[in-house]
Amino acid sequence: MKPENLNSFSTLSNLVAKDSNLIVQSTRMEFESNTYVSELWRMSKGNWRKFKSGNNNFSNPKFAKKSNDIFYVKTNRSVEDKSKSKKASSKIEMQSGRSVSSVFEIEGSINNYLLSNNGKFLYVITSEWNEEFKNIESKDSEPMYYENLPFRFDTRGIIYNKRGNVYKVNLETGKSEKVVDGDKHNIISIDSLVENNGVLTFSYDKHNSKGTMLEERIGTLKNKKIVDIFTKGMMGNLFYYGDELHAVGLRNRFEWPTNTTILKF
């Protein structure tokens, strides 16, 4: 790869398949605007063709459980350009045939989303400004003061003024409700989310009791309350094998150089 060809360098991710349908996310750097361009490509008659592209970024495609509908995240690309002060606008859209409808929209980042096993709901993980910081117009120029500096950082950069939330979206009515409130529980970020028999389990970061570092925890949502089932390790990438919950990571925090492992709960 020569320097003059860097504009053509793309990375591929989020490959999804259903029957003979394939969709993949392609991301490249646009150096003139200093921003990432993310598009969706679809396999059609043996050839890859652009499925979603334009002035917005498109990412994280998923096929519906019981139909041929396609979901994806659409993000205002100006959000990626830090020199612009436009508010973030992220939404999940659903394409059914040639019809496109907005399923969920938020002023903030959509980190991931999960289709319920019955196909009736979406569970959306977001990263939003906390209540105290949300109404500050020029957030980049606002000074920030910290009594403690946590050891770990998440991938979003300014984590101290962000909170992770989970919304439940009814695909039939279009209505949504916040089922995990990051402001209430002081959740800095949410990494992984799974559902089994209608019960949500997720891994998340929050400050320890002294406020000196971030701790990874795994919690289950029961009657709108978070019940922690694992607190001493560094776990993420939750998944079910059969009806048993598994996680990828370390049994004990900072247990280096122990190899990453898969643990069954």
Locate predicted features.
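Conserved beta-propeller blade repeats
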Residues: 8-22, 55-73, 79, 107-125, ...
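Multi-bladed beta-propeller domains
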Residues: 1-11, 41-59, 85-111, 169-189, ...
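Solenoidal tandem-repeat scaffolds enriched in leucines and small polar residues
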Residues: 130-134, 158-216
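Predominantly five- to eight-bladed beta-propeller fold
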Residues: 38, 80-89, 127-167, 214-217, ...
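A generic tandem-repeat structural signature
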Residues: 67-99, 133
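Beta-propeller domains
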Residues: 25-50
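Short glycine/acidic-enriched loop and turn motifs that connect beta-strands
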Residues: 28-32, 76-81, 129-132, 206-210, ...
